[in-house]
């Protein structure tokens, strides 16, 4: 029998159980055990309400970063990156080490994280780097007959919609649409197909439909690989922001407001001397509750769960966002 302590967290209501492997003495768990635990704990029918995945936090394998994040989705699959999750891990580690900025190791990169000015309502807000950014088909991987897909119609996917694809480093397929397309079932049909056996995206892909709201604001809805529709996907919001800036020739460094079903974030971008692009995702890092479970014979049983008062603060932002989005329909 093992007792596992957790913090229930969310970024833009993309919710997770954050599990510190060192404090729980589970650093020797196999990937299979981490996956099985995630499947059990993240079940939406569980007494704790489930989650989109588990954020496993442990020591970095490199010198410099204050910790490492590993993301396991609710179906047991591994996510190479999660922007919403990284914000909450950034807060957890920065508070643990009494810092305001640092570096955190992820599966594909070591990324800058820091505490940021609140988006409002005294919501804890953090800024995290999203990189590397790649457009080459092999980085997704993608097989649609082009080496780089940018604002192009792919008849095999849809006769009218123009798509762009980018990895950040997880793969994203993005199209800008109007409200009528958002209200249709096009996204669900396409995303479900591309995340089952198909010749175009053999490893699956996150599929985002984006609506322009103004010159400095967009709405993003994402079907996440391994999860399905979620309130928000941090890397998707970052990737969609970059594509919008490229399509409209926007200044990369200018903040873009990104609205989603889970709230609002801001995204900026920059290009270094070598021409490499990186993104900065700024949004909430909400701690919903702290608790513990018993894990025995592949069964997860709730032991304790104590709520914080932070969700009330975030709901004030959500209310504001919903009222704003009604005016854009």
Swiss-Prot record:
Enzyme class: isomerase
Functional note: Catalyzes the stereoinversion of LL-2,6-diaminopimelate (L,L-DAP) to meso-diaminopimelate (meso-DAP), a precursor of L-lysine and an essential component of the bacterial peptidoglycan.
HAMAP family assigned to the protein according to its UniProt record, in alphabetical order: DAP_epimerase
InterPro entries according to UniProt: DAP_epimerase_AS (IPR018510), DAP_epimerase_DapF (IPR001653)
Any GO BP: lysine biosynthetic process via diaminopimelate
Cited NCBIfam families: DapF (TIGR00652)
Molecular function terms, GO-annotated: diaminopimelate epimerase activity
Gene it is expressed from: dapF
Gene Ontology cellular component terms for the protein in this record: cytosol
Site feature Could be important to modulate the pK values of the two catalytic cysteine residues, where: 172, 224
PANTHER family: DIAMINOPIMELATE EPIMERASE (PTHR31689:SF0), DIAMINOPIMELATE EPIMERASE, CHLOROPLASTIC (PTHR31689)
Active site, per annotation: 82, 233
Subunit structure: Homodimer.
Name of this chain's protein: Diaminopimelate epimerase
């Amino acid at each position: 029998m093992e007792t596992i302590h957790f913090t229930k967290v969310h970024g833009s209501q993309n919710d997770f159980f954050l599990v510190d492997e060192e404090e729980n003495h589970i650093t020797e768990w196999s990937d299979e055990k981490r996956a099985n635990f995630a499947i059990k704990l993240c079940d939406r029918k569980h007494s704790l309400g489930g989650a989109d995945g588990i954020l496993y936090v442990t020591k970095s394998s490199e010198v410099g970063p204050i910790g490492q994040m590993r993301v396991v989705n609710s179906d047991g699959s591994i996510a190479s990156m999660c922007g919403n999750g990284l914000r909450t891990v950034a807060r957890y580690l920065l508070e643990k080490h009494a810092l305001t900025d640092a570096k955190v190791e992820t599966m594909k990169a070591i990324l800058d994280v820091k505490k940021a000015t609140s988006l409002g309502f005294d919501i804890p807000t953090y800024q995290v780097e999203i990189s590397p950014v790649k457009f080459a088909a092999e980085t997704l991987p993608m097989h649609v007959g082009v080496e780089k897909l940018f604002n192009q119609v792919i008849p095999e996917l849809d006769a009218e919609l123009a798509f762009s694809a980018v990895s950040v480093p997880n793969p994203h397929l993005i199209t800008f649409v109007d409200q009528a397309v958002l209200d249709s079932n096009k996204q669900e049909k396409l995303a479900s197909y591309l995340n089952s056996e198909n010749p175009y995206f053999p490893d699956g892909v996150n599929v985002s439909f984006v609506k322009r709201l103004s010159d400095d604001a967009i709405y993003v809805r994402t079907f996440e690989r391994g999860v399905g529709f979620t309130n928000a996907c941090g890397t998707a919001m970052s990737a969609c922001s970059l594509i919008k800036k490229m399509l409209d020739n926007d200044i990369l460094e200018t903040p873009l407001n990104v609205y989603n079903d889970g709230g609002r974030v801001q995204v900026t971008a920059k290009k270094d001397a070598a021409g490499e692009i990186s993104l900065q995702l700024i949004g909430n890092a909400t701690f919903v509750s702290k608790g513990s479970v018993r894990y025995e014979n592949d069964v997860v049983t709730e032991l304790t769960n104590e709520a914080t008062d932070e969700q009330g603060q975030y709901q004030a932002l959500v209310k504001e966002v919903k009222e704003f989005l009604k005016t854009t329909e």
